[in-house]
């Protein structure tokens, strides 16, 4: 989360689920919906989770104790990738991509997107 704060990132894109075929693929690095968790000198509040067809959008509020600032960060997670396969159609992935681009434009930030 320090990298998100330091680089002023406003959008995170995740293309994997945390588990695939019952095996852990990645660490869940965010708190549950409507909860906060502190990671070192950064507090992350998961303000909202919205489920779309094939993906989730989470809205986080990030508080940096070092920089005395609070920022809004969005995470888009594609959840329709089948275990050990490829999606039957790309329509949901393309739809998520459009939402990501729109979000980047709305934030007005030229900071990097984290994928």
Curated annotation (Swiss-Prot):
Reactions catalysed, as given in the entry: O-phospho-L-tyrosyl-[protein] + H2O = L-tyrosyl-[protein] + phosphate
Residues engaged in binding substrate: 83
GO terms for MF: protein tyrosine phosphatase activity
SUPFAM superfamilies in UniProt: (Phosphotyrosine protein) phosphatases II
Keyword Glycosyltransferase: no
Cystine bridges: none
Domain Tyrosine-protein phosphatase: 1-115
PROSITE patterns tied to this protein: TYR_PHOSPHATASE_PTP
Keywords: Hydrolase, Protein phosphatase
Protein name from the UniProt record: Tyrosine-protein phosphatase 24
Gene: STY-24
């Amino acid at each position: 989360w320090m990298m998100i704060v330091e680089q002023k990132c406003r959008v995170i894109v995740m293309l994997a689920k945390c588990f695939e075929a019952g095996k852990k693929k990645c660490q869940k690095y965010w708190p549950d919906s409507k909860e906060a968790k502190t990671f070192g000198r950064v507090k992350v509040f998961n303000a909202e989770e919205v489920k779309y067809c094939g993906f989730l959008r989470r809205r986080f509020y990030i508080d940096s104790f070092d920089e005395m600032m609070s920022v809004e960060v969005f995470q888009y997670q594609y959840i329709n990738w089948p275990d050990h396969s490829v999606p039957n159609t790309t329509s949901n992935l393309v739809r998520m991509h459009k939402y990501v681009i729109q979000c980047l434009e709305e934030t007005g930030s030229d900071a990097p997107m984290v994928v």
